[in-house]
Design a protein with these regions (language model features):
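Short, structurally constrained coil/turn elements
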Residues: 32, 69-71, 132
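Bacterial Sec-exported substrate-binding components of ABC uptake systems
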Residues: 7, 22-63
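Bacterial N-terminal signal peptides
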Residues: 10-20
Length: 148
């Protein structure tokens, strides 16, 4: 009887160990789960596990779109051109975003610790490569070139 009881306790301990370790593995895999992915104009697939929280925009067109579609708290910086009422349709809305960046200034962009940088397709591909090499997700968007 003592041997049976000892074997049952050992079996129960092994089962508890397996159950507890199985829970830990599942929780770890959920953390790295991809919620959605997007493909930019260069064909690069960008995967997101959650909505970006610190977006930097590198073009006035993307400034205008972001300010209309995204909560201001999720925008870390816009281009300095967004303040110019002569060329920006969102110069007043842009005032709530404090951060400003200029073209191809890697250090300034990195200082905002972005989780996404939105870049127009006319910007240099070398600069996009530098951003990606720094571990930043970069979405390159197509820029319209006609009114049609």
């Amino acid at each position: 009887m003592k041997i049976f009881f000892k074997n049952m306790m050992t079996l129960l301990a092994c089962l508890m160990f397996l159950v507890c370790s199985g829970c830990g593995i599942k929780a770890e895999s959920d953390k790295n789960k991809v919620a959605y992915s997007v493909t930019d104009v260069t064909g690069t697939v960008i995967e997101f596990s959650e909505k970006p929280k610190r977006i930097v925009s590198m073009g006035i067109g993307s400034d205008e779109i972001l300010l209309e579609l995204v909560e201001p708290e999720r925008i870390a910086a816009l281009t300095y051109l967004s303040d110019d009422a002569g060329i920006s349709s969102v110069s007043i809305k842009a005032q709530v975003i404090k951060g400003r960046v200029q073209r191809n200034n890697l250090e300034a962009i990195l200082s905002y610790a972005p989780d996404l940088v939105v870049v127009p397709d006319w910007d240099g591909i070398d600069f996009v490569g530098q951003l990606r090499s720094a571990g930043i997700k970069v979405y390159v968007h197509k820029t319209p070139n006609t009114m049609q």
